[in-house]
Amino acid sequence: MEDFYVEDYLVKGDRYYTKEHEWVRVKNGFAEVGITDYAQKQLGDIVYVDLPEKGKEVDAGDTLANIESVKNVAPVYAPVTGTVVEVNEDLKDEPGIINDDPYEAGWIAVIEMKDPTEVEDLMTAQDYAEYLKEIVEEEKEEEVEVKEEELIETESIEELSEEELGYEENK
């Protein structure tokens, strides 16, 4: 599964997404939940995360957590129905992890899903990238592209000359 970029916003290919900009990574009936790169950039510097309690029963659409940034307080909605079985305790001391790594270290909670087929109601990465494209185009008032990660041109450090790297070999 390919990752996508809409402008500078990363959309991970191995997740499902909501229109409220939450992501879900499903594994063996469990849903790891977090917020998207777009959401964390819109919030700005995150200063506090009000995490759910382990054992909390949630229905899809219920408030799962609240994220406080220097700009705003925003709810994080449960994308699926089930029971919270794990929360990211690291966010209590370092809520900015969400800004640094929203898709991995910045996860918020794990929900044991009541009905694993519920994820079929969520958007795929490609669908979310197209949805995000519309939002960004409206914000910028111009067209933007959805790019697959492999199509983004990068030069590996080995391909750069010593001059381009800013140093020369000692002779």
UniProtKB/Swiss-Prot annotation:
Binds 1 lipoyl cofactor covalently. It comes from the Bacteria. Residues 30-112 form the Lipoyl-binding domain. GO terms for biological process: glycine decarboxylation via glycine cleavage system. Residues 139-171 are annotated as: Disordered. The keyword Ubl conjugation does not apply. Signal peptide: none annotated. The modification N6-lipoyllysine is found at K71. Keywords: Lipoyl. Its cofactor is (R)-lipoate. Pfam families: GCV_H. The keyword Secreted does not apply. GO terms for cellular component: cytosol; glycine cleavage complex. Belongs to the GcvH family. The glycine cleavage system catalyzes the degradation of glycine. The H protein shuttles the methylamine group of glycine from the P protein to the T protein. HAMAP family: GcvH. The glycine cleavage system is composed of four proteins: P, T, L and H. This is Glycine cleavage system H protein 4. It comes from Aquifex aeolicus (strain VF5).
